[in-house]
Amino acid sequence: MQVLPPGSTGGPSRLFILRPVATTLLMAAILLAGIIGYRFLPVAALPEVDYPTIQVVTLYPGASPDVMTSAVTAPLERQFGQMSGLKQMSSQSSGGASVVTLQFQLTLPLDVAEQEVQAAINAATNLLPSDLPNPPIYSKVNPADPPIMTLAVTSNAMPMTQVEDMVETRVAQKISQVSGVGLVTLAGGQRPAVRVKLNAQAVAALGLTSETIRTAITGANVNSAKGSLDGPERAVTLSANDQMQSADEYRKLIIAYQNGAPVRLGDVATVEQGAENSWLGAWANQAPAIVMNVQRQPGANIIATADSIRQMLPQLTESLPKSVKVTVLSDRTTNIRASVRDTQFELMLAIALVVMIIYLFLRNIPATIIPGVAVPLSLIGTFAVMVFLDFSINNLTLMALTIATGFVVDDAIVVIENISRYIEKGEKPLAAALKGAGEIGFTIISLTFSLIAVLIPLLFMGDIVGRLFREFAVTLAVAILISAVVSLTLTPMMCARMLSQQSLRKQNRFSRACERMFDRVIASYGRGLAKVLNHPWLTLSVAFATLLLSIMLWIVIPKGFFPVQDNGIIQGTLQAPQSSSYASMAQRQRQVAERILQDPAVQSLTTFVGVDGANPTLNSARLQINLKPLDARDDRVQQVISRLQTAVATIPGVALYLQPTQDLTIDTQVSRTQYQFTLQATTLDALSHWVPKLQNALQSLPQLSEVSSDWQDRGLAAWVNVDRDSASRLGISMADVDNALYNAFGQRLISTIYTQANQYRVVLEHNTASTPGLAALETIRLTSRDGGTVPLSAIARIEQRFAPLSINHLDQFPVTTFSFNVPEGYSLGDAVQAILDTEKTLALPADITTQFQGSTLAFQAALGSTVWLIVAAVVAMYIVLGVLYESFIHPITILSTLPTAGVGALLALIIAGSELDIIAIIGIILLIGIVKKNAIMMIDFALAAEREQGMSPRDAIFQACLLRFRPILMTTLAALLGALPLMLSTGVGAELRRPLGIAMVGGLLVSQVLTLFTTPVIYLLFDRLSLYVKSRFPRHKEEA
């Protein structure tokens, strides 16, 4: 047994140094827990930060936007507006469709929100139109969130109506049942139906009207209870042939008698099997298709949901005929997995680089093995805590672990370097371990808790940004804590067992060359430091200039919100003149699709035309462009978008808006471009007055591009102006007029065909092929009081007017949304400021309000809290350091190093052409924690030298700087190389990781150079200040 010298207690490490078996088993337990935890961690793109969002869709075919607003949307909004926890309510009412999107507070569970929405719908039921084909349908889904998976179903042998029927009953319902799926939509609108197209001339010739025919059809097709017979011995169920199932049966239906002869429906109408809505269509790579979009519930695990769908797809497709082909066009999890894989590779690369730096400095394999064990052990142990906290393996947590490689090795390096110093002086390894670990224990604790203090403000950030970075901050803090434990337990124990004077003194040619190089560097640093200490005011001027420069750079640097990612999917909106019909839009989309599919970066394309819950008007079309994998194309998504827009620009009458899909979705509606700004008024008239003025002003701003609005008030409308007196004299009511028009032109759903598996509709309309346009109104006839028929023209005048194609509300008031992008050379901060300046110039009245939406609103909130976040981090670190040092002065000395980190980070971002977004801001906050460790290591040793060796402050800080130069350089390079893979990242998701790496590498490079000279000067300045205060106020004693 080795005899320990007096005072070699080892501090908190003593027990672990003297009990190597127990220490090894404890570390093995941490390792095992981490490995098991990793297997249970889900994989995601980002932490789950979705707002609880519910979409309520009501379809009322044939209703105008004005009718949808007043009869459907408004009653629902009044009930929804009374719900507690509602953050925002937006609605869009267009021809035949009402979509209300409800976004709740982050703290409200989605299931609770669902219950409140259902109760509100029930309360509004009595106020809704009685002839709604279906009640309002709600889905736990954010409409702005892109589908997690898109499938195209095509067939060369079967009509799309049959294909959709099979897909809906055999595939879509099964996928809807998968845990995590919020909504499955079938774009294409080819739901089977029996279509009855009335021949207006034949109907009029027989003295009939569309209303009498509708009544006849409705009465001829019923499916209701008929009762049963219960005799003394047997019970008999009653049934009848009260249902008609096919177009042929409807064609033979007798609707009236003329002179004793039956008039069948086929005599006055074309009856055929068709689609429920003939103004809907979808195409996959220009082929007619049923496009199935699968959206997840807010908060659901996207990887697990997609995996479940993939597993059941083979079984589901086997139930379809061989002529029906199901193709997965896009799967967002493919890019998510690739991004996570790239980040994992960068994590492993960072570990390798850090270990290489350790070997370069220590030049000793046993000494390198020790931190080489400590780093992965600390990182793997973190997984166990992540499982307990319900975290996931995502880009942010992996970024935290990558950055942590530079942090966690610091503690091990400091311990090893200190113990090695005593062994080289001739101490026995065990004694050196006890003495070195005991001496450095307080420093390790100071480094750990001061670094965690920097992360504390991140945990208290509000709203979605706080939720987003909570996993990042906690993961990093846990890794740092485990690292401190490992460095105070396993590291000194391994040093006592693996290091010796022989191993440390054993050198080869490379080691000797490195040693001579480090000796020359330290000697040069010593000479430079001596000169700096002899000219303190010059150094202080440099430090003060650094502070001013950091403030100036903060002001001028372009500011953004969240990096734009290349996920390989582009969402698009195709816009045409407001009077465009379905047929013209279908033709335009074919032209656009042909141009898009010619691009070498495009892998597949889906397009959709028509009005449904997602597409508001007939003059717009939705597109989803799926790009080839990143390694299979030459350009990033923004270059592809520019190329596609240039290719389509020559097609007359269309405007194409494209934006890349993002993992972080804050918006509540699908927008044409990336950013939104709303203009709201109390009336539509006030809104119509200010929309063109503001739009013209915004379009003139160089900081904005592709400015557009969803305000569409130039749609063509036929106004039927009924002479109520004439109508009353003939016994015709307004309800008769509405019914006649609805029967003719509303694709009215008049009856339901019930089968064992599904329900199908009977659609009534006029055959307008021979009388297109307004001339079709002249064929409308109504039944008068005496039983005769009267043409509509006898009681009404037809006027052509302009009318809105859609009416949008935000929190129950009319609103229009301006969408815009930011051109190259400008930042989101520039665009936001330009819009605010324009708003002031226009001098909007008090009843007109404006507001940024989605990511732009989040950017404003984040920008406003950024300075306070950094101040809070500095204050938290000052409090922790003040408690640890029992001093008001020394924490200020340590914190004086922070401006150097800010200057380096901001300069690096500007040189790299990167914006100061929230990812880069997190990097700057982390730099606050990293850079101050240099000062801590210097000041700890200087105070110890003053206290234990009686040195003067100047000699103490000079010696501390030289003694700690090597570990400072080592730990800084380790942190720098830990961030370097992020800065040089080029794979999937690199846009997210690169700003963090740039900020940290730049900050570390500049701060490493400056703090080695400014810290000792500021230390001596505050020491003299402390002596001055004590001399002036002798009763005031401050322990420094």
Swiss-Prot record:
Any one GO CC term of the record: plasma membrane
Gene Ontology molecular function: any one: xenobiotic transmembrane transporter activity
UniProt superkingdom: Bacteria
Transmembrane segments: 25-45, 347-367, 369-389, 396-416, 440-460, 472-492, 537-557, 863-883, 888-908, 910-930, 968-988, 998-1018
Family the UniProt entry places it in: Belongs to the resistance-nodulation-cell division (RND) (TC 2.A.6) family. MdtB subfamily.
Subunit structure: Part of a tripartite efflux system composed of MdtA, MdtB and MdtC. MdtB forms a heteromultimer with MdtC.
Name this polypeptide is given: Multidrug resistance protein MdtB
Native source species: Salmonella newport (strain SL254)
Lineage: Bacteria, Pseudomonadati, Pseudomonadota, Gammaproteobacteria, Enterobacterales
